[in-house]
Amino acid sequence: MRITHTSVHLGISRIIVTTLLVVGGLFGGDASAAHFTVFESGQVRPLALSPDGKLLFAVNTPDNRLEIFRVGNSGLSHRASVPVGLEPVAVAARTNEEVWVVNHLSDSVSVVRVNDEGQGGTVTRTLLVGDEPRDIVFAGHGRRRAFITAAHRGQNAPFNPQLTTPGIGRADVWVFDSDNLGNTLGGTPLNILTFFADTPRALAVTPDGTRVYAAAFHSGNRTTALHEDAVPDGGEAVGGVPGPNTNYAGVPAHETSIILKQEGQEWLDSLGRSWTSKVRFTLPDKDVFAINATANPPAPVTGPGGVFSGVGTILFNMAVNPANGKVYVSNTDARNDLRFEGAGTYAGTSLRGHLHESRITVLGASGVSPRHLNKHIDYSTCCAPTPNPESEKSLAQPTGMAVTSDGSTLYVAAFGSSKLGIYSTAALETDTFVPNSANHIQLTGGGPTGLVLDESRRRIYVLTRFDNAISVINTTTRQEIAHLSMFNPEPRSVVEGRPFLYDARNSSSHGDSSCGSCHIFGDFDSLSWNLGNPDLDVKANPNPIVPNLPEFGDDPTFGQNTSFHPLKGPLSTQSLRGMANHGPMHWRGDRNGGFTAPSAQPNSGAFNESEGFKQFNPAFIDLLGRSAQLPPEQMQKFTDFILQVAYPPNPIRNLDNVLTPAQQAGRDFFVNTTSFFHGACGACHTIDPNGNPGEGPFKGFFGSDGRSSFDVSTFFPRVPHLRNAYQKVGMFGTPVVFGKQPIDPFMGDQIRGFGFNSDGSIPTLFNFGSGFDFDPIQNAVGIPNTPEGHTIKKNMEQFMLAFDTNLAPIVGQQVTLTAGLAAVAGPRINLLVARANAGECELVAKGRFGPHEAGFLYAGGGQFTADRHDVGPVADAHLRAAATSNGGTLTYTCVPPGSGVRIGIDRDLDGALDGDERRAGSNPADPLSRP
């Protein structure tokens, strides 16, 4: 069933209704005509019940709203839809009347007042937190304290993230007193706790509210890449790269780095050889942290039970057993310390069909106990057509969980299987459970991300992300009894293509793996993998190459073999974000359309991103173990979807888009000063926000225009973009010389084993930049070996961490205006207006004036357009005055260009404005329902 809306007559303050009448028909059109920006944010806690169990709250991530449902014995009925921030991923109910929503892209938390038994709601406060917040729980005395996970960075964070400092924790938990949020712009936290891990995700709280658990997201697995300069040349026979060192035809591979895993105090390769003396850091792999929620202020738990290590590689969600206090962590564990894809005929080894394991790890007084959910799989066999008896017993990518009040049963959402799994907690804890499809509940929608138990009604409510809907499950019959669709503004190509990224039942013969196993929610896994295939041939490289400066000759390859050898060595997992308009794919550019047509920008030959992505189809067989490649029509749908996924704004760059002096100095050198054979850094790492202007919202080059270039690497690389450099901070300590920089001493504990470059073996951008130091023989135009040269490299590091991307840093930012916050909110609104005037975002304002909902879109020139045709252009000052009188609230949000009409004034893009539809009794969330 579709969501319906109760008709509400829209009234507005006297200040607004006296303005001029807007011309009708200005925003006519349909949803397919407007650009929808796909961020593919991973939901964490998408559902919550009110404490009295009468209301169900759901995040509508693509529509940037909180949906409110009335819960009854006969099912769910929709009551209200409340605009919040961009990409809401988690919700928690503090009381029956107050709900908090975590907005992943807006770096904010919306405090929503629910009224009229769920018939309406409004944002009364917007809290500003660190970058990419993900989860929220209430704990402490009276559950007054809100705990929120966020990355240790972001423009709203009141600290220096120290991105270039070793040994810094990068997992933050913000804590607010819900009864005393303060009068500052973004709220005043009680504390910001920082833990020694990379970006966090999930939270869990004990039933008594005294202890909160926080988990890292990409927590790692104690693996790293040892730079190829630290590995002897000549292959396994001389102590170098483990063999085979040729392909099946005997063609020697180039030298590469190697992947190591820390076992105790030793760093070992896949042959068990020790490289400990070469590694300049250790990885403690701290994964889950306990917090004393009642301390003043809340503080980490010290001593036993304070930190848990070795929980998993990618940690999704957590749940606490209310009966025994044990913590369950849904996770996947990567096997990237092993090698190769394909059948393994020549090498005798392969990861095909067994690259990850889906697990629930049990934490308790006895320690950390991982439980492989698919222990029935016979990994010695591969590639049977699906479905098959083995694959149907599997559960892939476990995410949200819920435990019954007596602690006896655990329900888990298997995101990659479109099922719920049911486990006896006793059997799970003792590892005596037997995988059985009889303990699965099939879901009509795909991609379940979260669930809540309604034990009094014997129901489970599950959010299914593939179709943006809610399934209702009868726990007695273990059957889905209802499925309610939420309004979804995503284009059909996104909805139809998304499952091919995540659906393990369709992707792998064992039913346990998908592309999304490594490309977590369309991004990366912060690991490197050696996925060469020695059973394959060497292939020619058709990609265009960046030319040299004339004084360095006319051979841009400098005689290097540019071919694609099938033994490529370790390479970092690349994000699937932002691939449109950036040419060939993979670090070498070996996925390209270069043999389909002459190469020319845009979209011809090697620059045809659609054709390039389709070259990944063999990986369904060679890596995931599928019986066959995807049929062409399915691969086309996958391609159409994935090329729309976008990068978020850069969280290091100032919100006004003005670089700091150091960043600007770094950019000036990067763009203008020759430091290598091609010229300046920007000769290869192209920065052109208008590159290929005909590509519309996908235009622009942000560190690469898709060409390859010579860079003194052992293979010939495609020039990589630099939009996500800030995500790779956390590895420090190198055993090799870069330029004139000495080898690092032992650097102690670090949070990441992979850094920069194609294989992740370069710890910092400063190390990378030092590779372009002046050398009279190797690089006579290099960066001077002087204090000034050192400063240049430091400045370039700062610039690259704040690198240009498709969206300006202001996109997603928001603030709520009320009478009590007018003084602090005013300057932030001024900033949002200024950036909208600069064309960096479209500014919308949503809220209430008395009992009436209202929406506005900034039209430029200091004027807003209302969501009613009988309300004329509204001056900025008049709108602010209206919001601060008579108890009004108005939340301003900078939204991506092209989405302002939909988010601000015409939700379904049917040409009938939302306010007009509410007055007429038609549905603003149904393009077929018009006044």
Model-inferred region functions:
Residues 71-74, 113-118, 178-181, 292-296, ...:
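Short loop/turn segments that connect beta-strands within beta-propeller blades
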Residues 52-54, 96-97, 143-144, 208-210, ...:
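Short coil/turn segments that connect the beta-strands within blades of beta-propeller domains
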Residues 153, 213-216, 220, 224, ...:
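Periplasmic c-type cytochrome electron-transfer domains
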Residues 35-67, 283, 396-401:
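Beta-strand-rich domains and repeat architectures in extracellular enzymes and scaffolds
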Residues 34-38, 45, 77-82, 122-127, ...:
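A short beta-strand motif characteristic of beta-propeller blades
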Residues 163-180, 283-293, 348-365:
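Beta-propeller blade signature
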Residues 149-168, 215-282, 329-357:
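Short, conserved, GDST-rich strand-edge loop motifs in beta-rich repeat architectures
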